[in-house]
C-alpha cells in the first residue's frame, strides 16, 4: 500500500510540475491578466478540469510559481558566504549576500519577471492581499542578511533598513536595464556597476567612524 501511495504521489507531483511549467510559459507570453486556465491547460496537454484539481485559479498557479522562485532565491542567499570564516567582517558578509541575490536575478531573468511582476508593469495584480504579503515576506527574508550586516557595521535599525532599501532599489534598477537591454546604450555592465555601488556603500559607512 505504501509503495502504491508513493507512486501516486510521484505521479501527482510530476503532473503538478508539468502544469507549472506550462503556466510559466503562458504567463511569460500573456501576463497574469491575459492568461486563463484554459490556455494553461492547452499548453500542458490537460483539460481545464485537471488543472482545477490542483489549483483553485490562475492566481494560485502564479503564486505557486513565485513561491518556488523565492525559495530558490533564499537558498542561494543562505549559501552565500559559507566560505567566510566566523571572524570575517560584516562588510565581507554584506558583499557576499548582496552579490547573491543580485546574481540570482541577473542569471534568471524569468524569475525577475515573476518576482517583480514585470509582465504587468511591476504591479501585483491578480494576487490576494494575503498571498501577496506572504510572498513579500519571503522576498524580504532574502534581503534581511544584508540588513543584518549593515547593522553589524554600526547602523541602527532604521538606518540599516534605509540603506538596504536603497541597495535593493539600485540593484533592481540595474537588473531592469540589463533585462530590457537598455544598459547597452551606455556601454556598461550591470554586475560591475552593482559591485561598485556595494563597495562605495561599505567605504562610506566605514568613513562614518
Regions inferred by a protein language model and the residue ranges of each:
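Amphipathic alpha-helical packing segments from all-alpha helical-bundle domains
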Residues: 77-78, 92, 114, 125-154, ...
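Amphipathic C-terminal alpha-helical segment
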Residues: 103-107, 148, 165-186, 201-209
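Amphipathic alpha-helical segments used for helix-helix packing
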Residues: 106-127, 176-184
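Generic hydrophobic, amphipathic alpha-helix propensity
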Residues: 15-23, 40, 65-77
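Short coil/turn segments at alpha/beta junctions that flank glycine-rich nucleotide-binding fingerprints
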Residues: 29-33, 108, 153
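Helix-turn-helix
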Residues: 18, 26-60, 64
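Hydrophobic alpha-helical connector segments
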Residues: 64, 78-110, 157, 163-167
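N-terminal intrinsically disordered/low-complexity leader segments
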Residues: 1-14, 209
